[in-house]
C-alpha cells in the first residue's frame, strides 16, 4: 500500500528566472516532478502566472506542481487547466481554509498540496492533521535548516 511505503522523489523547485529553460533541464536530468514557485504573486497580491505554467507544461513531460498566488477556487482551476498536475497552497490554506476543501471536492484531493513552514508553525503536527481533514492530498514541509527536531516532526506527521 502506497501510504505505508517510504519513497523519495526528486522535485526541483523553480522560481521566475528562466523557469522554462530550467524545467527542460530538470526534465532531461530525470526529475520526477517539478515545482514552480511564484512567491512574488502572493507577496504582490497578483494572480498566479498561468502563462508560465502553460509554457512549462508544454515543454516537459513530467508533472508540474504550481505554487504561489492562489487565493480563490478560480486560481486553482486556471492552474490545473493550464496543465499543472497539482496546486500547492500556503497562505490560502492559512487565510481561507475552506478553499482547501472546495478545491479538493472539485478537483480531487490528490491534486491539492498544502505547505507547512516548520520555522513558522507552532504546532506543525496538529496543523498537518487539520490540513488532511480539510482535504489536502499531500503536504509540503518547508524548513530553513534540517535539524534533528524537524526530522522528529516529519516522522510524527508521516504517522
Descriptions of predicted regions:
Residues 46-49, 76-79, 99-103, 152:
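Short secondary-structure transition/capping segments
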Amino acid at each position: 500500500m502506497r501510504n505505508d511505503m517510504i519513497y523519495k522523489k526528486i522535485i526541483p523547485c523553480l522560481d521566475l528566472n528562466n523557469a522554462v529553460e530550467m524545467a527542460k533541464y530538470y526534465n532531461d536530468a530525470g526529475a520526477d516532478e517539478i515545482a514552480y514557485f511564484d512567491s512574488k504573486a502572493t507577496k504582490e497580491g497578483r494572480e498566479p502566472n498561468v502563462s508560465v505554467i502553460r509554457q512549462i507544461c508544454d515543454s516537459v513531460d513530467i508533472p508540474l506542481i504550481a505554487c504561489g498566488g492562489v487565493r480563490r477556487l478560480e486560481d486553482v482551476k486556471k492552474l490545473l487547466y493550464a496543465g499543472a498536475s497539482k496546486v500547492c497552497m500556503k497562505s490560502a490554506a492559512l487565510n481561507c481554509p475552506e478553499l482547501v476543501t472546495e478545491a479538493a471536492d472539485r478537483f480531487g484531493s490528490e491534486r491539492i498540496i498544502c505547505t507547512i513552514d516548520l520555522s513558522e508553525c507552532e504546532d506543525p503536527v496538529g496543523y498537518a492533521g487539520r490540513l488532511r481533514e480539510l482535504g489536502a492530498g499531500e503536504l509540503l514541509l518547508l524548513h530553513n535548516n534540517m535539524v534533528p527536531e524537524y526530522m522528529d516532526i516529519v516522522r510524527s506527521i508521516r504517522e
